[in-house]
Swiss-Prot record:
This is Protein UL117. Residues 57-82 are annotated as: Disordered. Belongs to the herpesviridae U84 family. Pfam families: Herpes_IE2_3. GO terms for cellular component: host cell nucleus. The gene is UL117. It comes from Human cytomegalovirus (strain AD169). Keywords: Host nucleus. It comes from the Viruses.
Amino acid sequence: MVMFSQDHVQIVYGSTRICKSLAPANKRKTHRTIVVAPRRGFLRIPPDGQDVNHVKIVPTTSSSLAPPRDDERRPTPPLRPPLTVYPYGTSLIRRSARDAKLRSKLIVFHITRPALGQHPQNPGISGPAAMDHSEFLTSFRREVDRQTVLTAESAPATAEVCLGDALPGGVMGGGGLPAGVGSASAAVAAAAAAVAGVPVAANPVMPATATVTTPPMIDLTSHHRPLTLFTPASAAAAPAVATNGGNATYILPADCRYAPLFASKYKYVFEEVSRLMRLHDSTAVQLQISASCGNAFQALKSALLKLHNVTVLAGQQLITQTMPHTPQAVATFKFFHQDPNRVLDCIRPVVPRSTSYHETGVYQMWVSGATKKDLFDAVTLCASIVEKQPDVFNINVSLLTYPSIAAPHLPLYNEFTSFRLPTS
């Protein structure tokens, strides 16, 4: 299913779906094209992660389109540009520098009729339709950017953070917040101060210099400031409060108590990762994912590469020539390895004699995180994707004998390790 607006495009036909292919990469058919026909002179192709590789745009015909509305009953010029194939996921506005050269080609497609400027065959037409092509593109991009900003600003905020640096220790103000959130924040601050043993003023006033920051975050470099995470007033359960004697107070959000559905399905994976990270450092724990489908593996890899502070090593599994061991070799190996003190006695030079190797059709990926939280986020993302195709993926957790961490992750690792959770 492809999500397109019915006002702008009509799906003509699409090729069959590509799924679970174990063929070699050079013989696997991955090219899936969907053919669309625009309706109003331009076509928006939103990136929505569908299983489509290319989009083919064809000229509109009377048979492929529904009857036009009254405002669209105009004579269409006999312009039929050639068929063009564009990569699926190309949107009207691309912010990447590598697509700057293609922007003029991928924004507006004049297929149904010339919607801009003068008519190529009737130069006498003028008026609002005689707008310059570049001027129209500029105004169109500006309008799309403005709608994007308005959509981002109108999204409801799930939580707010109030930093009260100018207030005495333990006093939290509720000024600058909405009426509902202000009353809830005052009650939460009073509960936190009561637990910390700090007196609370009767009517705390927020100074003019106080700021409200969204989204909530804890500054690991200076976490001794009083910081409160406010939850919606409709939260059923009271938030958990942690304090270390009044120096810092952290109130956990109430929605962190409810795990998604896939957490119960892969409970053993989360529990094993948590157990290993309690016993060992995060640099010694690594996540291993195997997949039997190349397309699903690439989708998981693309999703993981959008996470922060992770390292990913991915590739296809190779198998060498299979050769059984002789009974004498098996007996010798087991005899020397029964006693740990005789392990070095059985070491002999190894001569590689395999004459062939080939791909097994299994794809493997190793994921490491800069901190324990980053590794746990990677496990959570993998579980949410693996849940959709459980017969394709396999998750494994490995413990390394020697710590492994990328050099750019060392500052973040040191800050995360030096942070101490306040004791209640």
